[in-house]
Amino acid sequence: MPRIIKKEDIQCHQQIPGFQIKSVTEALNQDSRLMEVKRLILDPNIISPEFTHTDIDQLLYVIKGDGIAKVNSTEFPLDKESILWLESGEKYHFISGNLGLEILQATAL
């Protein structure tokens, strides 16, 4: 059944000042065994923590802003509507630019 998820329904799991993780899947109040979707929000000029997902691939879509995704030791420039695919086991983090960075992260479980 289709559902609209409002911004105010999405809870924030803040990791460090200037960086937020918001779970869209949790806002639905249901456990999805197939997919998890999160919004990653970085204020301007912030370095996110490093992440590694050892058992899932991910699709990352830049909603707005600019910055860099550093995957292993390679830097990938990001701007609005960039799409980045990460395979399981890759280490990555984000560096937001002057506009900040907002990313939609989708993983198939």
Where in this protein do the model-derived segments appear?
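Short acidic-glycine-tyrosine-enriched beta hairpin
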Residues: 73-88
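A cytosolic small-molecule/anion-sensing beta-strand core signal
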Residues: 38, 63-64, 79-80
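Conserved short histidine dyad/triad with adjacent acidic residue
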Residues: 25, 36-54
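Short, conserved beta-strand element in jelly-roll/cupin
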Residues: 41-42, 52-69
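A short hydrophobic beta-strand segment most commonly corresponding to one strand
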Residues: 39, 85, 99-109
